[in-house]
């Protein structure tokens, strides 16, 4: 199933604006409850709850003591870009030179740089659903048209190559991919991505943006870099960062590897908006990326325990359906449409937004309604919380909906 907004869609679209307004209202409600002293359990967070590893903290302290406090190069310190190149080779079998790397203020800015550098008015960008909330807004802000492709109901939130191809037209400029996926946690296999690449070989002018920010948070399904597939390196922008894997969301370091001409364009764009990323965070990022990924496996191991725990508990709630255990990230994305049209504690639930607001107001648990991700029949629940918090939160929800 493919959904295109009308040609006259404003920037950003009114639908996206409505979703954003509801998110803002829900966030404000959660803060209001907390300010009143209410014990709100936050299962809406898109960030790890772990502390930053000590060896990375030490690198930041050393950078301060070594007086790294001036503007950095727009595209990042050279030694950080070298560390990123080594990381791409070690983890992803990708060979980039430093002039193909741009360090940004978070992976979100990396993607925005690509959109603003590449998309012209009326260009279409194919976005499989569910998708991270900012993708469509970034496309719209660049005067592009987001084209949403929906997977089949029992496909574990993954579109097929045939569905992807059905969305491509002569106006398609870009395809956005995200694996492991936020919000579903689904991971595309190498075989699935190879089928995508066969389709895209027919359309050599299309650029692929591969958002791999959750790369290291996976539970057995190998995470594949799209650029590593035959014929895809020259037309893929690989986006990553330190936020999720190293629990460094507030440090705001993302980066991309891209064809040289596109990296140069992104560098120019960034130079007129933010310039270089935070200098201390960049120095810490060097240490984070140079160390073995094995040093952060303890986080992934704990996330897997929490994933199994929350699925077991949520599946005991009538009306919640987790189709398959997510293979990556730290979210579950249960289908909840069986609850629509029902009344709980005197409140009618007509949609996922109603359900999330009800759960927040009555059970004091924060979640995110699925319409933010292009899936209005689901809600996103993060298991980036302690096991005790997860048990208490799901117990509250179950009691409310029973």
Q: What residue spans do the PLM features occupy?
A:
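Single conserved hydrophobic/aromatic residue that forms the stacking wall/gate
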Residues: 1-16, 20
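N-terminal small-domain helix-loop-helix segment of the aminotransferase-like
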Residues: 21-106, 113, 288-291, 401-402
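Conserved PLP-anchoring active-site segment centered on the Schiff-base-forming lysine
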Residues: 117-139
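A short helix-loop-beta submotif of the ANL/AMP-binding
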Residues: 140-147
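Active-site phosphate-binding strand-loop segment of PLP-dependent enzymes
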Residues: 151-221
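Conserved core segment of the aminotransferase class I/II
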Residues: 231-304, 308-317, 401
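Conserved glycine-rich beta-strand-loop-beta hairpin in the small C-terminal domain of fold type I
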Residues: 286, 302-314, 322-342, 377
């Amino acid at each position: 199933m493919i959904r295109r907004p009308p040609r006259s869609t404003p920037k950003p679209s009114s639908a996206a604006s409505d979703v954003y307004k509801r998110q803002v209202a829900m966030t404000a409600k959660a803060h209001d409850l907390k300010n009143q002293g209410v014990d709100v359990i936050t299962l809406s967070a898109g960030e790890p709850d772990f502390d930053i590893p000590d060896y990375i903290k030490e690198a930041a302290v050393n950078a301060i003591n070594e007086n790294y406090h001036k503007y950095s190069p727009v595209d990042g310190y050279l030694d950080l870009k070298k560390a990123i190149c080594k990381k791409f080779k070690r983890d992803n079998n990708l060979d980039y030179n430093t002039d193909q790397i741009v360090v940004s203020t978070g992976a979100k800015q990396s993607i925005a740089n690509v959109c603003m550098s590449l998309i012209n008015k009326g260009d279409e960008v194919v976005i499989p659903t569910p998708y991270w909330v900012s993708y469509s807004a970034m496309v719209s802000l660049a005067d592009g048209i987001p084209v949403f492709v929906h997977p089949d109901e029992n496909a574990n939130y993954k579109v097929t190559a045939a569905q992807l191809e059905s969305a491509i037209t002569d106006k398609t400029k870009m395809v956005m991919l995200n694996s492991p996926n936020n919000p579903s946690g689904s991971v595309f296999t190498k075989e699935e991505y190879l089928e995508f690449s066969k389709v895209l070989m027919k359309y050599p002018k299309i650029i692929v943006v591969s958002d791999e920010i959750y790369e290291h948070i996976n539970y057995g399904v190998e995470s594949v870099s799209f650029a590593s597939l035959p014929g895809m390196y020259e037309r893929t922008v690989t986006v990553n960062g330190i936020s999720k894997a190293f629990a460094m969301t507030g440090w705001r370091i993302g980066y991309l590897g891209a064809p040289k001409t596109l990296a140069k364009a992104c560098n120019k764009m960034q130079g007129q908006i933010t310039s270089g990323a935070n200098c201390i965070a960049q120095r810490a990022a060097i240490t984070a990326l140079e160390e073995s990924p094995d040093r952060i496996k303890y986080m992934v191991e704990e996330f897997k325990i929490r994933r199994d725990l929350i699925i077991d508990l949520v599946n005991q709630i009538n009306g919640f359906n987790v189709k398959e255990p997510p293979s990556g990230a730290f979210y579950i994305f249960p289908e909840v449409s069986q609850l629509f049209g029902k009344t709980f504690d005197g409140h009618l639930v007509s949609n996922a937004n109603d359900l999330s607001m009800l759960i927040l107001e009555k059970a004091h648990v924060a979640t995110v309604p699925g319409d933010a991700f292009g899936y209005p029949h689901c809600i996103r629940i993060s298991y980036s919380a302690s096991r005790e918090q997860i048990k208490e939160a799901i117990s509250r929800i179950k009691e409310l909906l029973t």
